[in-house]
Every structure is written in structure tokens, then in C-alpha cells.
Amino acid sequence: MAGLNETPRGNRIHIAFFGLRNAGKSTLVNAFTGQQIAIVSDVPGTTTDPVSKAMEILPLGPCLVTDTAGLDDEGELGEMRVEKTLKVLESVDIAVWVWGKADGLVPDKRSGDRFPVFAAECRKRGVVVLEYKRGEDVEGLKKKIAAVKLEERMPGLLDGLVKKGDRVLCVVPIDESAPKGRLILPQQQVIRECLDKGLVVTVCQPSEVPSALCLVPSAARPESVPYQLVITDSQAFGKVKGLLPVPATRGASGTVVRLTSFSILFARQKGDLQEFVKGLEAIESLKDGDTVLVAEGCTHHRQCNDIGTVKIPKALEKLSGKKLKFEFVSGTDFPDFCVSLTSGLETASPFFHPSLIVHCGGCMLTRREMLRRIALAKEAGVPIVNYGLVLAMANGLKVEDVLI
């Protein structure tokens, strides 16, 4: 349960160690973290999959440190390991290239041939590249990493939407798909940000919305608006909208009560909300037999009424009036479509070209990962839309009803 109390993966600075086999990456990662998180051996190819450890590095803050397999791994399994290693680049902020000694196992020339290609790929992705020579001081490397000036971090979930003292209502359905004894991560993060911003936050289920509205005395309501913002789980949009008051006098923002969802807040923070809105137009153009890719940034146990595999497909078929085919990916899996990188580090994935991508809010993804997925879709000419927007439309709301 400790993971529930840690800074989410998507909000950490990602640092990964790259190089050839037996360059000393795992030894360095163990020394860097102060723990034996990676297996160390003289046998080439000991590290088979990326291994990560969450830690704090001041003044950077919460980080995720990842050890990777050697980029020169060989054979069928070796190629799969290299592919896994390169997947790490999709989320990394700082890449450390580990130079091995010219000891016969990893000649410097081979590493030297590959490093310029690797560094160029990192620069293209906006990743900071540092170098470490085997045997150098580990504390010195930590200081180098701590001194890195990363581009501005992603904005807060509620930036520009509320001010200190505002009242926020969070509507959290508890159904068969809800985890026992806790809230899901997006709800946790939004509620925490409400507290950080000095907001007065009320949390209830959809059925308790009328009671929550009565908690705010009329004298405390500017222009008859009980809450400055209502945030709901996307699947409850229709029910919550019907329970909110429609006073004759509109609020100061020009709306009755501002309504949005947890998913849309994350799309606004980590992705490109306008690109998602554009993607909605593609729903009307879907035809019978078209393939829709449903993508989630995390992996979790699927329940009988799972939002990604059950509710989103139902919503899309309702909106389009068509019988559709669905493919599902989760976690770090995301197709490169027909995009081919010419850096020499990657090869194109098997051709896959859906008619539409529907993506979750991305609470477990970094902003870099989310924007890369949007860019891949855009480059391949595949419209992409967010869970929250699809569910809002399926519940009879208009885009302008939920965009804030």
C-alpha cells in the first residue's frame, strides 16, 4: 500500500541510464539509489527489462530512476530488450549515457559509434543527455543531475480556474469498478490540489449532490452560484448536470455552474485539449467496421463494467450509430503507427492505422509521454480524443458545457 502515499509516477522527473551491455549501468544505478535494485553480473545482457526506483533528488524533487538493457543486445530476444529500452525514451527527462571500459567486453569504439545517434535522438525529443564514465564519482553525477535546468514543469490541474477560498464540489461515484477502501489516483490528485490551493472542497457521490448544494448558505453564494467549480467522474456527467441548479442570475464567469470532469482536467494539464476537441468531429464520420484504439496510461484489474473496455465502446457506438471494432492498449504500450524513425535507433512498428484513438486522462503518464502520443497520432493522421469528452457527449452534454 506504500505506493498510494508516494508522488505519482507521472509527476516525477524521469532519469534513465543507457549504454551498451556490461557498461556498468546496473552497478551505477545501485550506487546512485543506495539500494540493490538491479542484478549485477559480468554476463552480458543481465538486465532484460527496465527496472525503476522512485526516490528524491534535491533540488529536483521526486524522481524515477530507471536501469535499462544494453542497446547492443543481440538475437531475437535481444532485439526485444532493445525495443523495451528505447520505449523508456518516451517518458525520460534526463538520459545518462554510461561509458564502459575498453575491457574486451564493451570496446569504447562500439559505444562511441552509437552515442552520437543516441544523443541526436534525445535532443530531438527534448531529453537532456549527460555522460558518465565508469569509475567516476557517483556523488558528482548526482550534482550534475541536480543542476539540470529542465523546461518548465506542467501546470497545476486547477491553474487559472479557481482562486483561494473558492468552493469546489468533487463528485465521486462508488460502483463495482471502484477500488475498495480508497479513491482512484485522478480523484486523489485533484482533491490534494484543491487543498494545496486553499479551496473549500466537498466530496460526495452523485446521489448526494442535492445535499451538497444545500451545505452552502445562500448568503455565501456570489450571484447564486453555490460552487465555483463542480468536478465529476466523466461517467456521471448526465446525472450530475441534471442535479445542478439553473438560477436566473448567472455566475460571474458567465456560466451557471462550471462543470467538468477529472479526465478533462488531466487532458488540459498533460495533453492538448484543443486537439482532443477536434478529434470529436471524427466520431460522426465513423463507419461500420472501423477500428477504434482505446488507450490507457496505466494497467489495472478490469472489472465487469470497466470504463475503457465497456463504457467507452458503448458510448462510441451510441454516438456514431455504427458497429465498431475496438483494440485496447495500456501502460507504456502505444503503437507508432506508420511513423518511421530514421535515427538508426528504432524501426517502425507493424502498420496499424485506426480510424480514431480514445485516450484516458493520463494521470500515470508524464506530460512528455502524453504529448508524444498526440504527436504520433497527428503525424499519422489519426484523430485522437479524450475519455471525458466522449462520455460528456454520450450523456447529452455539449463540448462548451464541460470545457473551462
Q: Where are the language model's segments positioned?
A:
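P-loop NTP-binding site
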Residues: 162-404
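A generic local structural motif
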Residues: 2-4, 25, 49-52, 80-85, ...
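Conserved GTPase G-domain signal focused on the G5
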Residues: 24, 135-151, 268-269, 396-399
